[in-house]
Amino acid sequence: MKNKNDSNEQISLPKEQVDILMGLYSSDKINEAIDMIKALNDDYPNVPLLFNLLGACYNKLGQFDPAAQFFETAISIKPDYAEAFLNHGIVMREVGKLDHAAKSFKRAVEILPSYVEAHNKLGVTFIDLNKLEDGIEHLEW
């Protein structure tokens, strides 16, 4: 019998746990959320949502390097995770890496063409990069 930690298989996280986590995050109980996510990660390895939430927590704490790493982990587990690409782009903007931010936002839009927030952030980032036509295209889409 295989140990669940030896597998790349994703195990579903119970909705009740997700609701509790979202409540902690929304209430700015970030350290509690981080502790809960780390505990859940032991029982539910390779769940991209947990890594995305860890990244969001560290971003909220202003710890951008670990935030970016957690978003990248979420993306490596689920390469079509538009929200993780959006969040990665947000962190890249925070640290002034506009080219990296644009790539992440663009990937989010490629995955989910109707993703309004990703289009807006991509448009603003293109404008900041003096790519005005590209920026306007995403702001007016």
Where are these regions (language model features)?
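TPR-adjacent "capping" and linker segments in tetratricopeptide-repeat scaffold/adaptor proteins
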Residues: 2-16
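Alpha-helical segment of the N-proximal tetratricopeptide repeat
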Residues: 15-43, 56
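Canonical positions in the second alpha-helix
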Residues: 40, 73-74, 107-108, 141
